[in-house]
Structure formats: C-alpha cells, structure tokens
Amino acid sequence: MEGIIICIKLGVVFLGTLFTWIFGAWDMPIVTLLVFIFLDYLTGVIKGCKSKELCSNIGLRGITKKGLILVVLLVAVMLDRLLDNGAWMFRTLIAYFYIMNEGISILENCAALGVPIPEFLRQALKQLNNKNNIK
C-alpha cells in the first residue's frame, strides 16, 4: 500500500514539473485559468444532468475545447520564450482572455441552474454576448 502512495506522489510531482516546464510558473493567471476551466466543465456537466441533455459526445467536445485552450496557451508561452525578455506577456494576455470566457460560461451555467446572479454581472454578460453576436 505504501508503494502505491509513493507512486501516486511521484506521478503528481512528475505532472506538476512537466506542466511547469511547458507552461511556465504557477502564477495567479495560470492557476485562475485552470480553476475556471475545471469549474466551467463541472457546471456544464451539472447543467447537462439537470436538463437531461448530458451525453458523451457533448462531454468529449467540452474536454476537447478545454484541451485546445491549453494549446493556444502553449503557443503564447512559446512566443514569450522566443522573445526571451523574461516576461510572460502573451501567456498572461491569453490567460486573461480565457479566464473571461470561462468565467462568463460559469455564470451562464449557474444562471441556467437557478443560481441568482447579481444584476451587474447579468448586464455585463448581456453586453458581452451582444458584442460576441455582432459579426
């Protein structure tokens, strides 16, 4: 049993090190983005269960979308490394962009589940949705 626990710990350390090597430091934008990605997927699954629209294809599309967000983030990291100025400029901008998108989706999912959303957040959502629908 102790050997299994050690293997799990080593796996977690390996994944954390790999993630840090790929995406850079675990600063607040990265941590926030990862938390928002998880919360968006979780609230989406809960919403799908409640509306009885949950299926594996929709779940796979959601996981794929989340994975592609990390691909875009990796492109930004590589651009920052190419510039070699010691700052995470592109990575931080991309993280903020997806934090906003994931945050909006979390609020929409919560609203669909009947959670009251403060009016100022509702108005912000409406404005952002209107801007996104204009092509």
Curated annotation (Swiss-Prot):
Family statement: Belongs to the bacteriophage holin family. Cp-1 holin subfamily.
Localisation per UniProt entry: Cell membrane
Keyword hit for Translocase: no
Record-linked NCBIfam families: holin_tox_secr (TIGR01593)
Listed GO CC annotations: plasma membrane
Protein name per the record: Uncharacterized protein CPE0383
A Pfam family of this chain: Phage_holin_4_1
Organism: Clostridium perfringens (strain 13 / Type A)
Alphabetized UniProt keyword annotations: Cell membrane, Membrane, Transmembrane, Transmembrane helix
Signal peptide range in chain numbering: none
Chief localisation class: membrane
Membrane-traversing stretches: 4-24, 26-46, 68-88, 93-113
Topology in the lipid bilayer: Multi-pass membrane protein
